[in-house]
C-alpha cells in the first residue's frame, strides 16, 4: 500500500508540476505577446508621427475683430490671415493700443537662419504696415510680452537660449528699447507672462525646465513680483502645474473682472495643436487653482494643424496658426 501511495503521490506531483510548467509558459507567452504588440504598435505610431512631422509647416498671424463675450462666441474661421514675406515665419503676436494706434509685436523667424527676432508693425485694417525690427541677436528670440507699469513699457521676450529672462524698457514706445534687467539667472525659462490680480498684485508666470531635456512644456512656475522686479517671491507649490497639456503659457487675455490664462495643448500627437482658455479661480502664495473653460483648435481654417498663442486689445484678437504647406 505504501508503494501504491508513493506511485499516486509521484503521479500527482508530476501532474501538478506539469500543470505549473504549462501555466508558467502561458503567463510568459502572454507577457511576450503583449510586449511585442506594445513595442511594434509604438513603433508604427512613431513612424506615423515621424511622417506627420516631416510635413513642412509654417506659423502665420491672424487677426479677428470682436465684440463682447468673445470667449464664448469666438469663431476663428472669420479671422483674416496676415501675410508674411516668403523667407519669414511670424508667430507669438501681442497687440497693444497706444495713442489711437494698434501695434502688433511678434516673433519674426528668419527661415534662412532659423532664428527668431522681435519685430512690430502698425495694424492697418487687417494688415501690418511699417514693420520694424526692435531686438535682433545671435540667439533665438520669441514671445515678445509687453507690460505697462506706471507709464513705463517693458518688453519681456523669450530668451531661453541665454538661460535667463532679459527685460527691456522702452526709450520711445514702440520702436526704441534699452536693456533694463535680468531675472531668474541660470534658469531655462520660456513664455514669461505677467498678470495683475484683483488686489493689484503682479504675478510672473513662466515655464521652466529643470533637467537636460530643456523641455518647457511640462511645468508652470509662479512668482509674486515685489516692486519694479526688485524681488520675486516663489509660489509655495511651484511648479503649480505639471502637465504638458495645460502648463505652457500661450499669450494673454484681458477681460474685465476675469483672470484668464491661455495655455498650449501639447500631447503625443504634436506641439501646439490648440489652446486652452483657463480661468484662474485662486491665486496667492499658498494656493493656485485654475479650470479650463474653453478649448480652441485651428481646424476650421483649411490646411492647418496648430494654434498656440492668443492676445487681445479692446477690439481685436490676434493669434497664430500653423499651416501645412
What are these regions (language model features)?
Residues 1-4, 32-325:
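Carbohydrate-active catalytic/glycan-binding domains of CAZyme proteins
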Residues 1-29:
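Conserved anion/nucleotide-ligand pocket segment
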Amino acid at each position: 500500500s505504501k508503494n501504491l501511495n508513493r506511485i499516486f503521490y509521484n503521479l500527482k506531483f508530476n501532474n501538478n508540476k506539469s500543470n505549473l510548467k504549462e501555466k508558467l509558459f502561458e503567463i510568459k507567452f502572454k507577457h511576450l505577446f503583449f510586449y511585442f504588440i506594445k513595442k511594434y504598435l509604438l513603433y508604427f505610431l512613431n513612424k506615423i508621427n515621424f511622417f506627420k512631422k516631416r510635413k513642412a509647416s509654417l506659423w502665420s498671424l491672424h487677426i479677428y475683430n470682436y465684440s463682447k463675450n468673445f470667449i464664448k462666441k469666438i469663431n476663428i474661421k472669420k479671422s483674416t490671415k496676415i501675410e508674411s514675406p516668403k523667407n519669414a515665419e511670424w508667430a507669438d503676436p501681442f497687440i497693444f493700443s497706444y495713442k489711437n494706434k494698434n501695434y502688433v509685436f511678434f516673433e519674426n523667424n528668419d527661415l534662412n537662419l532659423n532664428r527668431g527676432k522681435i519685430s512690430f508693425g502698425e495694424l492697418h485694417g487687417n494688415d501690418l504696415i511699417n514693420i520694424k525690427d526692435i531686438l535682433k541677436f545671435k540667439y533665438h528670440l520669441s514671445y515678445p510680452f509687453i507690460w505697462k507699469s506706471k507709464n513705463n513699457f517693458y518688453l519681456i521676450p523669450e530668451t531661453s537660449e541665454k538661460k535667463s529672462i532679459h527685460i527691456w524698457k522702452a526709450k520711445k514706445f514702440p520702436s526704441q528699447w534699452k536693456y533694463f534687467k535680468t531675472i531668474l539667472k541660470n534658469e531655462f525659462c520660456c513664455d514669461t507672462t505677467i498678470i495683475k490680480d484683483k488686489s493689484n498684485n503682479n504675478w510672473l508666470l513662466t515655464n521652466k525646465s529643470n533637467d537636460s531635456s530643456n523641455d518647457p512644456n511640462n511645468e508652470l512656475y509662479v512668482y509674486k513680483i515685489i516692486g519694479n522686479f526688485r524681488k520675486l517671491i516663489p509660489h509655495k507649490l511651484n511648479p503649480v502645474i505639471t502637465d504638458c497639456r495645460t502648463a505652457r503659457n500661450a499669450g494673454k487675455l484681458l477681460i474685465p473682472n476675469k483672470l484668464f490664462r491661455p495655455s498650449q495643448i501639447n500631447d503625443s500627437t504634436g506641439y501646439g495643436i490648440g489652446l486652452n482658455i483657463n480661468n484662474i479661480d485662486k491665486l496667492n502664495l499658498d494656493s493656485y487653482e485654475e479650470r479650463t473653460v474653453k478649448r480652441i483648435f485651428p481646424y476650421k481654417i483649411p490646411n492647418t494643424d496648430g494654434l498656440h498663442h492668443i492676445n487681445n486689445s479692446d477690439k481685436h484678437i490676434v493669434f497664430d496658426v500653423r499651416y501645412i504647406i
